[in-house]
């Protein structure tokens, strides 16, 4: 779905069938509208990420792991929702091959509420 679509359904099975991509990517774009960017992500260890320009939400579909963020370690499992503000260093640890997440970027560059000191 994209900016021209007014509504619709994004199907997990359809998106999962596109992973890995021909270039080996473990995430596929499923919805793009304005600042909203939704991908299905099925990561493999080790999980390397850099801080992002937008706020980010993860909906954990399956699996479990640990979100390492801002000097903290928070365990998560299927059904949980994770939030990472723009600019926060983060990654996953202690997860297996069954981890699947909807990854949602949204809002302006720098986040809805900028980090203190920025």
Description of each model-found segment:
Residues 1-49, 116-118:
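A short, N-terminal "cap"/entry segment at the start of jelly-roll beta-barrel domains
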Residues 32-34, 68-72, 95:
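Short strand-coil-strand connectors
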Residues 35, 57, 64-66, 89, ...:
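Structural motif
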Residues 37-38, 74, 90:
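Short, isolated positions in well-ordered beta-strands
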Residues 38, 67-69, 101:
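Short hydrophobic/aromatic-rich beta-strand segments that constitute the beta-sheet cores
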Residues 52-67, 107:
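Short, conserved beta-strand element in jelly-roll/cupin
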Residues 71-86:
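Short acidic-glycine-tyrosine-enriched beta hairpin
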Residues 86-112:
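Ligand-binding loop in jelly-roll beta-barrel domains
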């Amino acid at each position: 779905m994209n900016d021209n679509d007014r509504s619709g359904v994004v199907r997990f099975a359809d998106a999962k069938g596109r992973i890995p991509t021909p270039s080996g990517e473990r995430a596929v774009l499923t919805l793009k509208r304005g600042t909203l960017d939704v991908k299905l992500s099925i990561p493999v260890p080790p999980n390397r990420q850099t801080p992002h320009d937008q706020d980010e939400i993860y909906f954990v579909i399956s699996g479990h792991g640990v979100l390492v963020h801002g000097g903290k370690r928070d365990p998560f499992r299927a059904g949980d929702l994770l939030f990472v503000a723009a600019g926060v260093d983060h990654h996953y640890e202690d997860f297996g091959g069954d981890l699947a997440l909807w990854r949602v970027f949204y809002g302006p560059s720098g986040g809805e509420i900028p980090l203190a000191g920025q």
